[in-house]
Amino acid sequence: MPDWLIALILGLIEGLTEFIPVSSTGHLLLLGHFLGFHSPGNTFQVLIQLGAILAITGVYFGRLWGLLTTLPTEPGSRRFVIGILLAFLPAVFVGVAAHDFIKTVLYETPALVCSTLIIGGFILLALDRMKLEPRYTDVAEYPLKTAFIIGLFQCLALVPGVSRSGATIAGALLLKCDKRSAAEFSFFLAMPTMAGAFAYDLYKNIDKLSTNDLGLIGIGFLAALVSGVFVVKTVLDFITRHGFAPFAYWRIAVGVVGLALLYIPR
């Protein structure tokens, strides 16, 4: 299969999975492994996230603009923005400190990705079935302490296969946030987190990228942008109707199939 087609497929997968709790990075690493696709420093999986970043920023532009323009006058807007920044900080410190270990060890261990997909699937399924009475139904109501703790949960997603959205949503549910607002907070937190990961990874690996790499990243970026817009516009209603169980079953299935492909002789 030509590299450009693999890049297109991986870009579509990135956009389709980035904002749902199934681990986009886990899917990209497993697909790349089985398709024989490798990028210098494992940068492709991170850099095509720019498409997903633009997708969610475009869909939520009106909401973002409203927050920014009301910052001087609305205490609720200020608290929400501060909460997002507090939730973002833990991943900055842990991500920078562990960056090389994550990229050279964890990203190169497909069995770990499969295992975390399965374990995370069972955890998500358990949380979905728990009858937790929500205390918060609007992201603007989240206390700063709640936002910061959700940010600590996000650090778990530095392990590929855990899922950034899955970790933050799980943390929010345990902190008595309802499903829809938990997913929405995860969306907003994704913007600085993914933008930061993109910028730092580009800084660390810019000298390793060739013209061909940039072309493949461009294809993946565009595919992630298009598929990401579709998911962001539809996933909140899907979660409201169906909860997180479908994503949990998908994670478990992908993890089991991945382990089978890795260890069953062919």
Swiss-Prot record:
CC terms in the record's Gene Ontology section: plasma membrane
Subcellular location: Cell inner membrane
Transmembrane segments: 4-24, 46-66, 82-102, 105-125, 142-162, 182-202, 216-236, 244-264
Topology within the bilayer: Multi-pass membrane protein
Main localization category: membrane
Enzyme Commission designation: 3.6.1.27
GO terms, biological process: cell wall organization; peptidoglycan biosynthetic process; regulation of cell shape; response to antibiotic
Keywords: Antibiotic resistance, Cell inner membrane, Cell membrane, Cell shape, Cell wall biogenesis/degradation, Hydrolase, Membrane, Peptidoglycan synthesis, Transmembrane, Transmembrane helix
EC top class named in words: hydrolase
InterPro entries: UppP
Record flagged with keyword Transmembrane: yes
Keyword Lyase annotated: no
Catalysis: reaction(s): di-trans,octa-cis-undecaprenyl diphosphate + H2O = di-trans,octa-cis-undecaprenyl phosphate + phosphate + H(+)
Molecular function terms from GO: undecaprenyl-diphosphatase activity
Its job: Catalyzes the dephosphorylation of undecaprenyl diphosphate (UPP). Confers resistance to bacitracin.
Cross-referenced PANTHER family: UNDECAPRENYL-DIPHOSPHATASE
NCBIfam families in UniProt: PRK00281.1-2, PRK00281.1-4, undec_PP_bacA
Miscellaneous field: Bacitracin is thought to be involved in the inhibition of peptidoglycan synthesis by sequestering undecaprenyl diphosphate, thereby reducing the pool of lipid carrier available.
Family: Belongs to the UppP family.
Name under which the protein is recorded: Undecaprenyl-diphosphatase
